[in-house]
Amino acid sequence: MDTLIAQLQRRFCDFTISLYHQGFLDDQFTELKKLQDECSPDFVAEVVTLFFEDCEKLISNMARALDQTGNVDFKLVGSSVHQLKGSSSSVGAKRVKGLCVTLKECCDSQNYEGCVRCLQQVDIEYKTLKAKLQDLFNLEQQIVQAGGRIPQVDI
């Protein structure tokens, strides 16, 4: 059993490090992890789940607004992307946050094609991050269920 725990912990550390090295996460995610303790072991997963729900709503709102060809409310899209950038920043979603900056610039210049293209990239990046973080949280659960502790990962 100890070998299984050690293998899971190693996979967890390697996977976590890869998320930082590939630019999916930044130091804010590390800060968020520091707020998690024995009293609130699911804190990060809960915060990230709320982030995912926010992302889906905001991306959907922006897609609907951009669907109004010839009558796009760029202020609405800009407001939604600003919220998404803030949410992304608060959980350490580095790539999503970076794309939000570009999308905001497209909104500010009322570049319709740029907005559509950037929003598609945001959606892809969000879905990729969601899958990766769900894998990370699943690894955490496997470690705990095997009787192990989640290792501290130094980036």
Swiss-Prot record:
Residue stretches in coiled coil: none
Gene induction: By salt, cold and drought stress.
GO molecular function terms noted in the UniProt entry: histidine phosphotransfer kinase activity; protein histidine kinase binding
Reported modifications of this chain: Two-component system major event consists of a His-to-Asp phosphorelay between a sensor histidine kinase (HK) and a response regulator (RR). In plants, the His-to-Asp phosphorelay involves an additional intermediate named Histidine-containing phosphotransfer protein (HPt). This multistep phosphorelay consists of a His-Asp-His-Asp sequential transfer of a phosphate group between first a His and an Asp of the HK protein, followed by the transfer to a conserved His of the HPt protein and finally the transfer to an Asp in the receiver domain of the RR protein.
Modified residues (N-acetylmethionine): 1
Subcellular localization(s) per the UniProt record: Cytoplasm, Cytosol; Nucleus
Expressed in which tissues: Strongly expressed in roots. Detected also in flowers, leaves, siliques and stems.
Cellular component terms (Gene Ontology): cytoplasm; cytosol; nucleus; plastid
InterPro entries, per database record: AHP1-5/YPD1, HPT_dom_sf, Sig_transdc_His_kin_Hpt_dom
Keyword terms of this UniProt record: Acetylation, Cytokinin signaling pathway, Cytoplasm, Nucleus, Phosphoprotein, Stress response, Two-component regulatory system
Gene3D superfamilies in UniProt: HPT domain
A Gene Ontology BP annotation from the UniProt entry: antipodal cell differentiation
A Pfam family recorded for this sequence: Hpt
Residues where Phosphohistidine is found: 82
Superkingdom, taxonomy of origin: Eukaryota
Residue stretches making up the HPt domain: 40-147
Record note on quaternary structure: Interacts with the B-type response regulators ARR1, ARR2 and ARR9. Binds to ETR1, AHK2, AHK3, AHK4, AHK5 and CKI1.
Biological function: Functions as a two-component phosphorelay mediators between cytokinin sensor histidine kinases and response regulator (B-type ARRs). Plays an important role in propagating cytokinin signal transduction through the multistep His-to-Asp phosphorelay.
Domain remarks in the Swiss-Prot or TrEMBL record: Histidine-containing phosphotransfer domain (HPt) contains an active histidine that mediates the phosphotransfer.
Protein name: Histidine-containing phosphotransfer protein 3
Organism ancestry: Eukaryota, Viridiplantae, Streptophyta, Embryophyta, Tracheophyta
The encoding gene: AHP3
